[in-house]
A protein has these predicted regions:
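Cap/insert and terminal regions of metallo-dependent hydrolase folds
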Residues: 53-129
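Core dinuclear metal-dependent hydrolase active-site scaffold
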Residues: 3-64
Length: 129
């Protein structure tokens, strides 16, 4: 995707507005989305190590959130199947949101409009069922 120096892209498909924004991840062109149609808004964010402050306004008080809650930090650190380097990558700003980080961000973002929160990108090995 050609960002032309921008951190957000705005697309329209008929009545659907799609805002695409960069996430902080070690994959090329990792992005999140805000879908809007009339007064309904839906946020989709996975594959990010943190949420940049400049996106808070864009992400605040939406109807639906699908939000990364990848791992429990202690379970990740105690997992013998993950090398230390992998653990450090997952925990980094270019990795994945922990359950604690996800709940922190959601507590700042949700509002009166919010009806649904769906936790996504949950690690099968480093998260409680």
């Amino acid at each position: 995707m050609d960002w032309n120096g921008n951190s957000k892209i705005n697309l329209f498909i008929n009545d659907l507005n799609v805002k695409i924004f960069k996430t902080s991840h070690d994959a090329v062109d990792s992005v999140g989305f805000v879908f809007s149609n009339n007064d309904k808004e839906f946020v989709y964010v996975t594959d990010t190590g943190y949420i940049k402050n400049k996106y808070f306004e864009l992400l605040t008080n939406k109807d639906i959130y699908v939000f990364e809650s990848n791992h429990d930090v202690q379970m990740l650190m105690d997992n013998p199947n993950y090398p230390y380097q992998t653990k450090q990558r997952i925990l980094s700003d270019k990795g994945h949101l922990s359950n604690k980080d996800s709940s922190f961000y959601l507590s700042k973002l949700i509002g009166k409009k919010t009806k649904h929160i769906i936790l996504a990108h949950l690690s099968e090995q480093n998260n409680d069922k």
